[in-house]
From Swiss-Prot:
This is Thymidylate synthase. PANTHER family: THYMIDYLATE SYNTHASE (PTHR11548:SF9), THYMIDYLATE SYNTHASE 1 (PTHR11548). The gene is thyA. It comes from the Bacteria. Catalyzes the reductive methylation of 2'-deoxyuridine-5'-monophosphate (dUMP) to 2'-deoxythymidine-5'-monophosphate (dTMP) while utilizing 5,10-methylenetetrahydrofolate (mTHF) as the methyl donor and reductant in the reaction, yielding dihydrofolate (DHF) as a by-product. This enzymatic reaction provides an intracellular de novo source of dTMP, an essential precursor for DNA biosynthesis. HAMAP family: Thymidy_synth_bact. Pathway: Pyrimidine metabolism; dTTP biosynthesis. GO terms for biological process: dTMP biosynthetic process; dTTP biosynthetic process; methylation. It comes from Deinococcus deserti (strain DSM 17065 / CIP 109153 / LMG 22923 / VCD115). InterPro entries: Thymidate_synth/dCMP_Mease, Thymidate_synth/dCMP_Mease_dom, Thymidate_synth/dCMP_Mease_sf, Thymidylate_synthase, Thymidylate_synthase_AS. It is found in: Cytoplasm. One of its GO terms (molecular function) is thymidylate synthase activity. The keyword Secreted does not apply. Its main location: cytoplasm.
Length: 264
């Protein structure tokens, strides 16, 4: 994950000071891309410990199409609590848009089921897209989608995925997002009978919060270690069939965690 460290160093050296919605302040650059070959290991940052349990449960929660944090809380995952109302509701966030995008005539579109079927039937399609950025419902969301749009691509029997992330919290959020979408790519590849290809991360406003700068500098003093391997239960053949116990991470030997506050 040297390219992640290089990205962080680039923002520290060349970022522009900007204000932001949270009032924290950032160093920011506009536009960046990283590519990860999923045959070379699972792209989980090794220069600090990353909480895989939260990553897996959040992705499964997205795939459930839920707008409530009850499932996350049930499994000890609190990453969405800051934005939930007293009843645990978040409005029509990621999972709702992925699994139940509303149409003007009152129907709902399951984008995930649709894209999996498209990959199986028409793998050369240029429309293998899922979007969480529903302009008509942004105001109802507790937090508008940061990772807003992703596209699959099939070539030579391999499935690749590219994510566009409009707003990228480089220190806390981006390692999480890379691992989440890399995992989704592995899952979709398995259920469509393909091998994993690349995960491509593309960012818009890429920023380090000013209260993360010292932590970022500390992380840059550490040497990346060998990437781990993610094993999926080969018996799972449908995306909705995955459960937490179907994922096994092997060979993860990270440096210790580095704490940093979340900007809300």
């Amino acid at each position: 994950m040297q390219q992640y460290l290089d990205f962080m160093r680039h923002v520290l050296e060349h970022g522009t000071e900007k204000t932001d919605r949270t009032g924290t302040g950032t160093l920011s650059v506009f536009g960046h891309q990283m590519r990860f070959d999923l045959q070379e290991g699972f792209p989980l940052v090794t220069t600090k410990r990353t909480h895989l349990k939260s990553i897996i449960h959040e992705l499964l929660w997205f795939l459930q199409g839920s707008s409530n944090v009850a499932y996350l809380r049930e499994h000890g995952v609190t990453i969405w609590d800051e934005w939930a109302d007293p009843d645990g509701e978040l409005g029509p966030v990621y999972g709702v848009q992925w699994r139940s995008w509303p149409t003007p005539d009152g129907r709902h579109i399951d984008q995930i089921a649709q894209v999996v079927e498209q990959i199986r039937r028409t793998p050369d399609s240029r429309r293998l897209i899922v979007s969480a950025w529903n302009v008509g419902e942004i105001e109802q969301m507790a937090l508008p989608p940061c990772h807003a749009f992703f596209q699959f691509y099939v070539a030579d029997g391999r499935l690749s995925c590219q994510l566009y992330q409009r707003s990228a919290d480089i220190f806390l959020g981006v390692p999480f997002n890379i691992a989440s979408y890399a995992l989704l790519t592995l899952m979709v590849a398995q259920v469509t009978g393909l091998k994993p290809g690349e995960f491509i991360w593309t960012g818009g406003d890429c920023h380090l919060y000013t209260n993360h700068l010292e932590q970022a500098r500390k992380q840059l003093t550490r040497e990346p270690r060998t990437l781990p391997v993610m094993r999926l239960n080969p018996d799972v053949r449908e995306l909705d069939g995955f459960r937490f116990e179907d994922f096994t991470l092997e060979g993860y030997d990270p440096h210790p965690g580095i704490k940093a506050p979340v900007a809300v």
